[in-house]
């Protein structure tokens, strides 16, 4: 079905837990503006976050699908989830803050620290329960990134006319969680985890300065019981997942699907923790891929798909989701084809070595995305009339 394959080597900066953590009792103040200030000291570092509401990454009609036959889970309180999401874009924090009872904070503090409630501590201090602040380090590892060029793709590199001021760009996601990923959330909430992850993706997209909004409209939770029925494109006989073959089968399956959730999504992404890579001619598997996506096809129904691997946690997952989404929006790797003017050594998200500026997109990627969103024949799924809160500058 798909004939062109680009495999490019890049050094992914991953967040690896160091084993260091400290128990803290964070203080929080909420101002009239809705901004929350959180302070604590951990691992010899004074932390102060100024957090703004960030519930827009969850759609008002957010839908969770699970169960043997893919039923809608009506137990999810959408407005409660949205109300508890906050971010500090300046430092790269994305948190779920639960004040229904004792204060519970969960999520990303910055690129080096995570916070979660400490369930081993029963006592509280001045009504504040204990939290663990966990240190992670950035570890450079080599992985391959895969881009598939659908047959008949004709790429242009010219601007069209700018978007009218009353038009905004919003990318709506559906995440399909492969059973190994779903299983890891027997205790903690997947919805909270993916919402915090999506806020990190939003912070990364903000570096494009194009006013792009992102939102999760649905999660399809796969389990061992429903995976074969709801996602027959996922291999059953082998734990290893051939990235190209799986994406090919995934696209073909959903291309013929009448599922309204899939139809309404701008990007459909499979999340897995299984080994993702390729087999050689002797059947040896190389576990070397973090992601795979179609290039320049966000609004093409049969090609709006990607696969990402969660390898070392939420920050790496956010980076990979942003990276593969940018491919669908038309971005090449820095230093390649449409991004020749940006060196891969600069270290942006789309470079082979993103340890320097790994939270931002390069000027070349911005140019390609800007070209896509101004091409009326291509941008129809992500450009919409702005609401009162989202007027473009």
Swiss-Prot record:
Expressed by the venom gland. Residues 1-15 form the signal peptide. Its EC number is 3.4.24.-. InterPro entries: MetalloPept_cat_dom_sf (IPR024079), Peptidase_M12B (IPR001590). GO terms for biological process: membrane protein ectodomain proteolysis. Binds 1 zinc ion per subunit. It is an enzyme of class 3 (hydrolase). Contains several disulfide bonds. Keywords: Disulfide bond, Glycoprotein, Hydrolase, Metal-binding, Metalloprotease, Protease, Secreted, Signal, Toxin, Zinc. Zn(2+) binds at residues 323, 327, 333. This is Venom metalloproteinase BumaMPs1.
């Amino acid at each position: 079905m798909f004939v062109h394959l680009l495999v490019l080597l890049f050094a992914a900066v991953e967040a690896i837990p160091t084993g260091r953590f400290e128990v803290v009792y964070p203080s929080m103040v909420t101002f009239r503006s809705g901004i929350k200030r959180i302070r604590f000291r951990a691992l010899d570092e004074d932390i102060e976050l100024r957090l703004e509401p960030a519930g827009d990454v969850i759609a008002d009609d957010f839908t969770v699908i699970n169960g043997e036959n893919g039923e809608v889970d009506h137990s999810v309180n959408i407005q409660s989830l949205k109300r508890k999401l906050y971010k500090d874009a300046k430092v790269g924090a994305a948190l779920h803050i639960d004040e229904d009872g004792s204060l519970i904070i969960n999520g990303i503090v910055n690129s080096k620290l995570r916070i979660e409630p400490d369930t081993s501590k029963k006592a509280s201090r001045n009504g504040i329960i204990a939290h663990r602040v966990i240190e992670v380090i950035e570890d450079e590892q080599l992985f391959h990134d895969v881009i598939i060029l659908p047959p008949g793709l004709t790429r242009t590199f010219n601007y069209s006319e700018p978007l009218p001021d009353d038009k905004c760009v919003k990318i709506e996601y559906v995440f399909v969680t492969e059973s190994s990923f779903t299983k890891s959330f027997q205790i903690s909430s997947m919805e909270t985890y993916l919402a915090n992850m999506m806020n990190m993706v939003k912070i990364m997209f903000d570096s494009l300065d194009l006013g792009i909004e992102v939102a999760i409209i649905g999660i399809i939770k796969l389990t061992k019981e429903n995976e074969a029925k709801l996602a027959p494109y996922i291999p059953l006989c082998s734990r290893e997942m051939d990235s190209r073959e799986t994406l090919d089968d995934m696209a073909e399956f959903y291309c013929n699907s009448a599922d309204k959730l899939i139809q309404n999504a701008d990007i459909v992404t499979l999340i897995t923790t299984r080994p993702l890579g390729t087999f050689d001619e002797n059947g040896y598997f190389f576990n070397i891929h973090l992601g795979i996506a179609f290039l320049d096809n966000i609004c093409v129904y049969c090609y709006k798909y990607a696969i990402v691997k969660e390898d070392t946690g939420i920050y790496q997952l956010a980076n990979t989701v942003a990276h593969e989404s940018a491919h669908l929006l038309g971005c090449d790797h820095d230093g390649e084809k449409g991004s020749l003017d940006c060196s891969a050594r600069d270290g942006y998200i789309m470079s082979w070595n993103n340890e320097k500026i790994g939270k931002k997109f390069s000027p070349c990627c911005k140019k390609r995305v800007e070209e896509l969103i101004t091409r009326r024949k291509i941008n129809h799924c992500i450009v919409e009339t702005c609401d009162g809160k989202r007027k473009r500058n």
